[in-house]
């Protein structure tokens, strides 16, 4: 317990001393005739830093989940927030029947193929910037890339990491991805087993869901959100299930009085756990690795939650276990 208190003091004390600068732009993918809004948040002082690519949920934008991008950037990560035309805020702004717009856009974008191709395009643009511009080369580490997202954004992140696409078309795997954060991942049955769907993912993964995390416009039920975690076999992975957490805790509520009294607590827990995960996997920080493998990891989350961990090819290691699991390819102190 003493170590975790010390680490949390470090994580949210010294870890937040980095000032933040941000810039917005639109990158045009001529091959697909798509304009992709992007917001890049850089930490200061200037030094090469790992990259976190983030994909919003249905109806979101580059401003979605600012609580995450602000926190991660303040801890020294480059955050790249990507907006997806066709499933972004423009589907509902100025509309009367908002729920119908959400449902229609969700079904049209269910496979997340277009979203995933957006993310790959943004990664390609970043690579070109690093190769052609010394200032970007000094700030962006393309060898340490993580990707995260909410719902359809989480699906896009998993597709980049090697999940079989829902449309069972060509693979969207991108070997540049080293870590995945899946917030409320959606699941639908296919004509192959879930083990086959997720078996190729090798990147370390953190899944976060809630006990009330039923889809609002999508069909996934709360108890199904854990399926990717259970089905994966080749990845070091973690699952946090927040007690009482619903589907709106991640990106905010359009109507603020519809619940949400504990949203700030849930979001603080998401920040704490995801920040520790990124620091362990992308920066290989010994204290973060120790915290991720702590017997009392629930203290890191800070809210009531169940915590589960599994290593590659392992059986379940649940909360309260006395087994310590080492993250693969990471240096231990």
Model-predicted segments: where are they?
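The feature captures the conserved acid-bearing segment of alpha/beta-hydrolase catalytic domains
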Residues: 170-244
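Serine-hydrolase catalytic machinery in alpha/beta-hydrolase-like enzymes
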Residues: 30-140
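Alpha/beta-hydrolase-fold serine-hydrolase catalytic core, especially in secreted/extracellular enzymes
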Residues: 244-248, 252-333
């Amino acid at each position: 317990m003493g170590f975790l208190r010390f680490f949390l003091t470090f994580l949210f004390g010294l870890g937040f001393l980095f000032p933040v600068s941000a810039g917005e732009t639109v990158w045009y993918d001529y091959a697909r005739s798509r304009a992709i809004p992007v917001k890049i948040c850089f930490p200061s002082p200037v030094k090469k830093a790992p990259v976190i690519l983030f994909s919003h949920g249905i109806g979101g934008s580059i401003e979605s989940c600012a609580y995450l991008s602000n926190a991660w950037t303040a801890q020294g990560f480059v955050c790249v927030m990507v907006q997806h035309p066709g499933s972004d805020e423009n589907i509902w702004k100025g509309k009367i029947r908002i729920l119908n717009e959400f449902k229609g856009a969700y079904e049209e974008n269910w496979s997340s193929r277009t979203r995933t191709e957006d993310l790959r395009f943004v990664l390609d643009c970043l690579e070109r910037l690093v190769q052609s511009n010394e200032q970007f080369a000094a700030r962006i580490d393309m060898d340490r890339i993580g990707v995260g997202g909410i719902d359809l954004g989480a699906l896009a992140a998993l597709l980049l990491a090697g999940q079989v696409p829902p449309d069972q078309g060509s693979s969207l795997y991108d070997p540049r991805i080293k870590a995945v954060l899946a917030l409320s991942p959606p699941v639908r049955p296919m004509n192959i087993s879930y083990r086959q769907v997720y078996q190729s993912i090798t990147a370390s993964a953190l899944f976060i869901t809630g006990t009330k995390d039923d889809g609002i416009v999508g069909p996934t039920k709360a108890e199904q959100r854990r399926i990717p975690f259970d089905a994966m076999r080749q990845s070091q992975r973690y699952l946090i299930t927040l007690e009482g957490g619903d589907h709106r805790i991640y990106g905010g509520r359009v109507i603020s009085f519809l619940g949400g009294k504990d949203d700030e607590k849930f979001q603080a827990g998401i920040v704490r756990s995801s920040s520790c995960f990124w620091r362990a996997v992308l920066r290989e920080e010994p204290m973060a690795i120790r915290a991720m493998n702590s017997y009392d990891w629930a203290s890191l989350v800070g809210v009531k939650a169940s915590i589960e961990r599994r290593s590659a090819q392992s059986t379940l290691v649940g909360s309260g276990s006395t087994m310590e699991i080492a993250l693969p390819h990471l240096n231990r102190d």
